[in-house]
Amino acid sequence: MPKKILVLHTGGTISMQADASGAVVTSSDNPMNHVSNPLEGIQVHALDFFNLPSPHIKPKHMLALYQKIKEEADNYDGVVITHGTDTLEETAYFLDTMEVPHIPIVLTGAMRSSNELGSDGVYNYLSALRVASDDRAADKGVLVVMNDEIHAAKYVTKTHTTNVSTFQTPTHGPLGLIMKQEILYFKTAEPRVRFDLDHIQGLVPIISAYAGMTDELIDMLDLEQLDGLIIQAFGAGNIPKETAQKLENLLQKGIPVALVSRCFNGIAEPVYAYQGGGVQLQKSGVFFVKELNAQKARFKLLIALNAGLTGQDLKDYMEG
């Protein structure tokens, strides 16, 4: 029996073409729909679910993908989502925190549009189909497949503006590799809390620390509209003392604040006890989020709030 794979196209560079001037533009005719399938034992059913550049993707679109996957899961052995690379990691992480069905779910994209020299779209697409048809992938969580590598949605991030090997997993490395004749996995995804949301809303912005920062950015926030805040802190988890003092206002109003490091590698933890240091911030109620970058920590908090987590449950989830 062939493996039936549902493909959900959402737009992005993988669906685009370069015009005569070299500018990459959207196309109503997705070139991936014209790719002949040379893979034996794989039957593809493709849908043009969205046609959006990924900076236009919102949480509501991610939720729609989740709902479509749940709706169709019994009819397919795996799912491939083609997606723009700018926010691909956020969609992948969102899906990875949902109660997705126990089938392989793989996201892929391209760094070069379909008619550019060295286009990587078709190769990544076929690689994603191979992984989605592999039963072993069902136990790995939501996956990102690009450039012969398999990455866990939780950890992968876009690291280069144009390079085809842009998707990397800092600290941990890839989950597996795609070889000519086989797929090699050398890591497993850890168990995680999953949610079944039917709506997602809320305002959780990201603020990055910088030298000389005081309290001006916090003052600009409309606290009546704010549901939570992500701080991208220095080093192990430190911010200027003026900013730390202003965060107290948010915390006293019951607005959750979560912290990650702005460093590319490593994990934020409370180490320093000076004003604005991580020890003081944790004592004041700031959540220290492990192993996630700011954009994923934002989704972690947004999802937790929409799931109704509060108090100690929210703290345990955010810091777990």
Where are these regions (language model features)?
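ATP/NTP phosphate-donor binding region
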Residues: M1-K70, Q245, N265, F288
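Accessory alpha-helical/coil subdomains and C-terminal extensions
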Residues: P2, L8-G12, S28-P38, A152-I231, ...
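Short Gly/Thr/Asp-enriched flexible loops that form oxyanion-binding sites at enzyme active sites
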Residues: G84-I103, I239-E248
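Short acidic, glycine-rich surface-loop motifs adjacent to enzyme active sites
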Residues: D74-L88, E224-A236
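A glycine- and small-aliphatic-rich helix-loop capping segment at beta-alpha/alpha-beta transitions
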Residues: S21-D29, Y93-I105, G121-S127, K158-V164, ...
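Short beta-strand segments
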Residues: L8-T10, I81-H83, V106-G109, L143-N147, ...
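Internal gly/pro-rich beta-alpha loop/helix module
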Residues: L107-I178
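ATP/nucleoside-binding phosphotransfer catalytic cores, i.e., glycine-rich phosphate-binding loops
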Residues: K241-G320
